[in-house]
Amino acid sequence: MSYDANAAYNSGAPGQGAPGAAGQGYGGQGFGGAPRGAASPDDLSLPLYGASFGQAVKRFFKNYVNFKGRASRSEYWFAYLFVGLLMIVPAILYSIGLGMMGASASMAAADPYGMSAAAGPSGASIALTAIGGILMGIIGLAVLLPQLAISWRRLHDGNFPGPMWFLGLIPGVGGIIVLVLMIMPPKPEGQRFDV
């Protein structure tokens, strides 16, 4: 005997006004099925489920400081991947500069008579560290509000209020809590945050 899911559950349409009826009950918001997504990448009012990398980055910057509505998991994670890729070159410059400073400091410390030519950090190491740090600061400031906004909208897609983002400020466990919330699948009830 095989299992028939349609027979196991009421496969008929719910009655008029039943909470599970799409478009009915709960004020006609349609919480009964899967979450409603954007039909076009240009529709910024709804999340774009299955967004490509390019679509997610465009939507990330077009919704620069929009804290209303929802963002899909693909939009959220591709936007964070983009920011991570932007930070690679400045982080490498910064790390090389710090490494050069550390090497010159260890050479100076290893010379007991102070006769080493490398008595301090070189100009190149200072320049690399400064350039890398400044670039990371500029990029970080440029994407601070968009990252906060997309995190806020991603929480909405999981039916969590946006201010739950501030749980990430709890030392030790806050980042893990927010990470778990961002991984959660979308919930139809999150449509209450749509504009």
Name each model-derived stretch.
Residues 2-82, 148-164, 180-195:
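Membrane-interface extramembranous regions at the lipid-water interface
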Residues 75-102, 125-151, 158-184:
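Hydrophobic alpha-helical transmembrane segments in multi-pass membrane proteins
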Residues 44, 48, 53, 65, ...:
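Non-transmembrane, interaction-prone segments in cytosolic or luminal domains
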Residues 4, 13, 40, 111, ...:
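Serine/threonine-rich low-complexity intrinsically disordered regions
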Residues 98-110, 193-195:
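Short, surface-exposed, charge-dense and proline/glycine-enriched linear segments
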Residues 7, 20-23, 37, 106-124:
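Gly/Pro-rich, low-complexity intrinsically disordered segments
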Residues 29-36, 122-125, 135:
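Short hydrophobic/aromatic-rich motifs at helix boundaries and adjacent loops
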